[in-house]
Every structure is written in structure tokens, then in C-alpha cells.
From Swiss-Prot:
One of its GO terms (biological process) is actin cytoskeleton organization. Residues 102-121 are annotated as: 10 X 2 AA tandem repeats of N-M. The keyword Metal-binding does not apply. Residues 1-33, 60-101, 150-174, 192-271, 286-317, 357-379, 441-483 are annotated as: Disordered. N-glycosylated. This is Uncharacterized protein YER158C. Present with 784 molecules/cell in log phase SD medium. One of its GO terms (molecular function) is actin binding. Glycans are attached at residues 63, 123, 236, 437, 442, 498, 535, 541. PANTHER family: PHOSPHATASE AND ACTIN REGULATOR 1, PHOSPHATASE AND ACTIN REGULATOR PHACTR. Keywords: Glycoprotein, Repeat.
Length: 573
């Protein structure tokens, strides 16, 4: 039973060999075969193929037998120690069935039989080693990963039983690189493209070749620290092209030589000297610039304190001739040179014509003495009406002679203190006979009327007297009816003038007119004989009332007013 290695497993526990059960017995003992089963000790247990274990075990046993024969101590490497791992899936030594005890006793008692079995199995392993000599037994110092993790697809005789890394991946199975990884690996060294273009890595292009390779090029120690013009750039271009045309072996050799030279203490000292010299130059240039700026600042301050330029004096008076001197400065080698002065007589004449700049501000002319300074509006209007006193001799006994003179200029016939019975037929009250028999004063004695073609007459009579310059025929009854029927706007040739309040009394902003009106109304109310129908018939206010009633009638019937604003129409009382 022990010689059937293909169907059995063995494990080393201490110095005792225990024969494990066959696959059929393992299934009956409920030993899991699944992959990726994690144990409590963070070690993954996987099913190991039968053929691989048997062959590997036979190899180990054969080596042990050789070592025993030579007198060397027995060592066995890379053997799975199932007992050392704390697992719940494998059977423990304490709860082993009786058949394991019997097998253990047989193993301890029959060592000779084991030796014979090892000799027979050694013949098989030698044939395996001859077929695959590259897979040999290697010691594994790590006992943590002594349990092997080999997938079932690699369970053939080609793969050996070796410990895997913690990532549980087989190191001998190499993954295929991606195109990006291949390109990156290729770009680490210089190579040539299929089109003939050479590629050189950046680290090789930046480094300069040693002087031995290019004798014509200057050494690194002789190169200037400051940047120069075209020749140096051309040399650098030639050097760069030379590095691009070299082979990879030459570039590697040049890099090695340069590294050795750069790491030498002499090169380090020279580099430090160059760096210190470079910073000294920068410091000296900065200090010189600062000194120049300080000198320039001091010069500008002195110029401000002591200006050398001739500034013309301001013009104070025009009595003395003024000369304006122009100086133009030109810069030559950072120095200002003054050009000789030029006199411009034209500008001088223009300035003299302008005069002094300190002029008196423009003020309005003084107030005329003829302008009234009266505070009252009524007295102001009376003042303007009484200005013309030259025609006082032609005026009648009335006070407002100037007002009557203006009426004579605008109207041909003026009725004084006459109350017409009807406003529609005012001319019926005056006849030629009345005008012939009446006494009148011709205004042409003193001064003729300028606006009237014929001389106008001014007659002062009683209530029924009038002034007329031409006879007015009496209208017929038909014409009066036609005028009343058809209303039209016209300008009369005569005017009725009554001795009433002045024009200032009719001002709406002044309440004098209303006060006088209410006084006359109250007087008429006290005398009931003055009432004629609905109108007041007093001698003083009858004309005013008739005018107001006519205006109210016109507003009520004839005046065009919007229907929405008709309620806001103002009527006289």
C-alpha cells in the first residue's frame, strides 16, 4: 500500500511520517477542495494535485536516503507541514480516527519497508530530473509560506512545488507587457526608428560628451558662464547632433566616463569654484547698478535744489515790453545741452493785445432809476398807467385819460358811462342827430389819432350820450333776428366804457374785486326795489352782473369742453 505513491499523500510531522488518505477518503472526511479558502492564521490552503505531491515527496525521500547513506543529517525542504498550520478544514492529530494511529504505528515499526519504497520512487524522480533538469529542489527558509498555492491548471509535472510570494502569484509565469510598457522600456536607451530617425533619451542629450571623444570641442572648465551669441549656439547644435548620431554603446560609455569624472573631488571643486565665481559676478553687477542709481538720485536732487534752467517771469504789467525766451534741450551722452534762446515777437504782440489777466468780473449794469420799486402790484400798475402825462389837456374830466387815449387808437366809437339795453344791438342807442346836437371835444386839436383814418371824437355825456366819428345806421328787425339765429365771432367797431374799478381790481390773485362785488350785492339785497327778475339791477353793479352772466352762459352752452372735465368749469357767482 505504501508503494502506491500516485494515490497517496504524506506529510512530515516532527520525525514521523503519516500517510494521508486517498481522494475518496478525503471526500468522506469532508476536507474542502475549494481554492481561496482563508484560514484563521492568514494562510491560504489550497488543494495540491496528487501527482505533484507524490513526485515531490518521492524526490525529498530519495535525497534523505542519500544523505543517510553518506552520514549527513536528514533535511527536507519545501515539504508542506499540514500540522503546523492552524486550520479547521484538515484533521487534527488529537481527533484522528483509529486508522491513522494504525498507519502511524506501521510507519514507526517498518522503516525498512519505507526505505525500499524510497529507493523505488527515487528511480521515478531521477527520470523526472533528467526530463526537466532546470526544476530542482531549493531550500525555502521561510516557513510562513510553506504551504503551496498552485492552481489546478498548472498541476502537471512541469511545475515544481515552490513557495509563492504573499501575493499568491506564480513568479515563473510572466505576464505580457502592454504596448505602453514596451514603448517605455524601449525609450530608456537610444534606438533608431524604422524611418531612419535616431532617438536619444533626454538624460543622454543634456549631458555633454567628454573631451576625449570630441577633441575639437572646448572643455567644460573653459566654457564661459555668461550666455553668448551665435557661435556658442552653433557649437551646442553641433554637439547635440553628434550625440544624436552616436550609437547606444558609445553613449553608455560616454555617460560612464562623465559620471566618473563628475564624481571625482577635482571636478566637484572646480564646479564649486565656477558657481562661486558666477554669484560673485552677479553680486558685483548688482552693487555697481545700485551705486549708479544712488549717484543718479543725488544728481536729480541737486538739480531740483539748484535748477539751471531759465524760467520766464510772470507778466505783471503791460507797460514794459515782455520777452519770451524759448530754450530747447537736447540730450547728448546723457547730458542736457541748452540751445540758444529764440525771441518770438508775434507771441509778445498777442499777449499785449490780450491785456492783463486779472480782469474785473462782469457785473450787470446798475438798476435804472425809471424802474419802479413799488412793492404793491396795484400801485405798480397805476405807476405805469400814469407815465404818459403829455396828453392830459385833451382828456375830459375823467381820471384815466391815458386809458381813453388808447381806446381811441383801437376803436372808432367809444361810449362813456352808457349802459346799453342789449349787448347785441349797441349801436341803436346812438344816432346821428344825438351826435350832432351833443357837445363834444375833438381830440385832433392837440394830437390826431395815429391808428384811425378819420379823426375820432371823445364825448362825455350822461348815461344816454355817446361818442361817434361816423353815423351808425339803425339795423332792421330782420338783420337782428338773423344775427341772433346764427352766432359767430366778430370784432365790434364801438366800445362802451363805464367808470368802474381799475384793471388792478380785476386781478384774480387779488380779492379786492370780489370784496367790492359782495359789498354791492349786499347793498342790493338790503334794497329789495333793485331786484328785476333774477338779476340785480343796481346802477353800479348791473353791468358787471350782465357780463358775468353772459360769460357763464357761454361756458355752459357754447364753449367746447371735454365731457370728463365739464364738472370742473368755473362759473361766476
Amino acid at each position: 500500500m505504501l508503494q502506491q505513491g500516485s494515490s497517496s499523500r504524506r506529510s512530515l510531522h516532527g520525525n514521523d511520517f503519516h500517510t494521508l488518505t486517498s481522494p475518496s477518503r478525503r471526500d468522506s472526511l469532508s476536507i474542502p477542495r475549494a481554492v481561496d479558502a482563508r484560514s484563521a492564521s492568514t494562510i491560504d490552503l489550497f488543494y495540491i494535485p496528487d501527482a505533484t505531491v507524490s513526485r515531490r515527496h518521492s524526490t525529498l525521500v530519495a535525497n534523505r536516503s542519500d544523505n543517510n547513506g553518506n552520514g549527513a543529517p536528514m533535511r527536507q525542504y519545501n515539504k508542506p507541514n499540514f500540522a503546523s498550520s492552524s486550520t479547521s478544514s484538515l484533521p487534527s492529530t488529537r481527533n484522528r480516527p483509529s486508522r491513522y494511529d494504525n498507519m502511524n504505528m506501521n510507519m514507526n515499526m517498518n522503516m525498512n519497508m519505507n526505505m525500499n519504497m524510497n529507493m523505488n520512487m527515487n528511480n521515478h524522480t531521477t527520470s523526472d530530473h533528467n526530463a526537466h533538469p532546470q526544476y530542482r529542489c531549493r531550500p525555502n527558509p521561510s516557513r510562513r509560506h510553506s504551504l503551496m498555492t498552485i492552481p489546478e491548471k498548472y498541476s502537471g509535472s512541469r511545475y515544481s512545488l515552490r513557495s509563492s510570494p504573499p501575493t499568491y502569484s506564480n513568479p515563473r509565469v510572466r505576464k505580457e507587457l502592454t504596448p505602453f510598457q514596451l514603448q517605455r522600456k524601449q525609450m530608456k536607451s537610444a534606438f533608431q526608428f524604422p524611418n531612419g530617425e535616431n532617438f536619444t533619451p533626454r538624460n543622454q542629450i543634456a549631458r555633454l560628451p567628454p573631451s576625449s571623444t570630441f577633441p575639437d570641442s572646448p572643455s567644460s572648465s573653459s566654457l564661459p558662464l555668461t550666455q553668448t551669441g551665435g557661435p556658442s549656439s552653433a557649437d551646442n547644435d553641433s554637439i547635440a547632433t553628434g550625440t544624436n548620431n552616436r550609437s547606444p554603446q558609445q553613449t553608455k560609455a560616454a555617460d560612464a566616463n562623465q559620471k566618473s569624472e563628475s564624481e571625482s573631488p577635482k571636478a566637484i571643486r572646480s564646479n564649486s569654484k565656477k558657481i562661486s565665481r558666477f554669484f560673485r559676478k552677479i553680486w558685483s553687477s548688482k552693487s555697481s547698478n545700485s551705486a549708479d542709481s544712488v549717484e543718479e538720485n543725488s544728481k536729480t536732487k541737486q538739480k531740483r535744489k539748484n535748477p539751471e534752467r531759465v524760467v520766464p517771469e510772470p507778466i505783471t504789467s503791460l507797460d514794459q515790453p515782455v520777452e519770451i525766451i524759448k530754450q530747447s534741450f537736447s540730450t547728448v551722452n546723457n547730458h542736457e545741452t541748452a540751445v540758444p534762446s529764440i525771441k518770438d515777437s508775434g507771441i509778445v504782440q498777442e499777449l499785449t493785445a490780450l491785456g492783463d489777466n486779472n480782469r474785473i468780473p462782469v457785473l450787470p449794469p446798475p438798476r435804472s432809476p425809471n424802474r419802479p420799486t413799488l412793492s404793491d402790484k396795484r400801485t405798480t400798475k397805476l405807476y405805469y398807467c400814469s407815465q404818459d402825462s403829455s396828453n392830459e389837456d385833451i382828456a375830459p374830466e375823467e381820471k384815466s385819460t391815458v386809458f381813453l387815449k388808447r381806446l381811441q387808437d383801437e376803436w372808432s366809437t367809444v361810449y362813456l358811462n352808457k349802459l346799453p339795453l342789449t349787448a347785441s344791438v349797441p349801436s341803436s342807442l346812438s344816432t346821428t342827430t344825438d351826435a350832432a346836437n351833443s357837445s363834444f371835444i375833438n381830440s385832433s386839436i392837440s394830437s390826431p389819432a395815429p391808428s384811425s383814418s378819420s379823426s375820432s371824437s371823445l364825448v362825455s355825456r350822461g348815461p344816454m350820450q355817446s361818442i361817434s366819428s361816423s353815423p351808425t345806421p339803425a339795423p332792421s328787425s330782420g338783420s337782428s333776428k338773423s344775427k341772433n339765429a346764427v352766432k359767430s365771432l366778430r370784432f365790434a367797431d364801438e366800445i362802451y366804457v363805464n367808470d368802474t374799478w381799475s384793471a388792478a381790481d380785476y386781478c384774480r390773485c387779488d380779492n379786492t374785486f370780489l370784496n367790492n362785488f359782495f359789498k354791492g350785492k349786499s347793498q342790493d339785497i338790503t334794497n329789495p326795489s333793485t331786484f328785476v327778475g333774477n338779476n340785480l339791477s343796481s346802477t353800479k353793479n348791473i353791468s358787471n352782473i350782465e357780463i358775468k352772466m353772459e360769460v357763464n352762459e357761454f361756458k355752459r352752452k357754447e364753449m367746447r369742453v371735454h365731457q370728463d372735465s365739464a364738472k370742473y368749469t368755473h362759473y361766476y357767482l
